[in-house]
Amino acid sequence: MNLLRLTLAGTPVEMGRQHGRQIKPLRPHLLAVIEQRIAELRQLGADNPAVVQSCLDFMAEADRPLLAYLAGLSEALTIEPRRLQLYTLSSYLRDLWRAQQTIPSASPPFVQEGCTVWAASGPATADGRPLLVKNRDYHADHLPLQILAHVAPADGYRYLSIGSAGSPEVFSSGINERGLAVADTHVLSRDIGPGLPRFSLMRELLTHHDSVASALDYLRSVPHMGAGTLMLADAGGTLALCESGHRRCGYVISHGETALVNTNHFETPALAGQWIEDEPPALRGNSLGRRRHVLTALQQGWGTVDLPWAQRLMAAHGSPQEALCR
C-alpha cells in the first residue's frame, strides 16, 4: 500500500497547518471518520464535557505542542477546533468509559486494535544490527488515512513517522536521525487518567532523545495517560519496553540478550492486573496468542533474523488467536 507522504517543518502550529494543507484530498473521508467517532462517544455517553476539559487543562500546562499542532491542523482543514480535540481524545474517552463499567459482560464488546510489535538486536539478528518491527492493525476506516511524515522540528532531531491524516504527527511509530526508534500498541486498561498520550510521548522521544537510556529517563519523569505500550530501540542495540499506565508504569530492558515482544496486554507485575480483555469470543486470547507466536518464531530463528525474515513473519495469517496480519 502506498502511503501519502507529508513534509513537515517548523513550529508545532506551522507543522499542523502544513499537515492540513497536504491532506486536503482526504478531507471528506476524514470528516466522516471524525463524525463517526464523535457519534460513538455520544451514544455511549463517553463525551462528558468535564472529562474532556480536564484533559485539555492538563495539556494546556504539560503538552502545549500538541494543542498548537491541532490548532494549525484545524485551521488548515477548517474544522472546529473543539471537534478535532474531541476526535483526538476519542480512544482515551472510550477506554475511560469502558474501564468504569462495573460488570465487563454488561457492556458491548469492542474489537480492540491488534497491533503487534517486537524488537531484536545483537545475537538475535543476522548482522547484529537492531530491528524494531510493527504490524499496524487499526480501525479499517484509517487505511486510506495512513501517512508517512518527514518531520523537521524547529527545535530537535529530524525524524520519520507513520501515522494517520488528521491525527498528531507520531500516531503509530517513528525513527529519528540519531537512530532512536519507537512504536506503540494499545491496551485497554483500568489505569488511565489525564496525562501525556502515547503520541505525545513518542513525539518528545523522537524530537529530543538519541538513546534508549535517555528515553527511559524522560518516560520516568512525566505523567502518562496510560492505556498502551511503547517499544524502543536505539542504534547501539539497546531495547526497552515501557508498559504505560497513569499511576504506574512497567519497564523491561534488553541489551540484545533477549528479544522483546508486546501486543495488546500487559505482562509486567506493575500493570498485568490492570488489563481488561474485552473482545468478542472468537478473538478472546488473541493478544496472548500473537505474543506467543512471535516469541516462538524468534527463538527458532535466533541469529538469522533480518528484514525479509521479519516481513514473512508479520504477513502470517492463521487462526484468530494467533494471526499477526488480520
For each feature predicted by the language model, list its residue ranges:
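Internal mixed beta-strand/loop scaffold within catalytic domains of large alpha/beta enzymes
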Residues: 91-201
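Surface-exposed flexible segments
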Residues: 143-149, 242-249
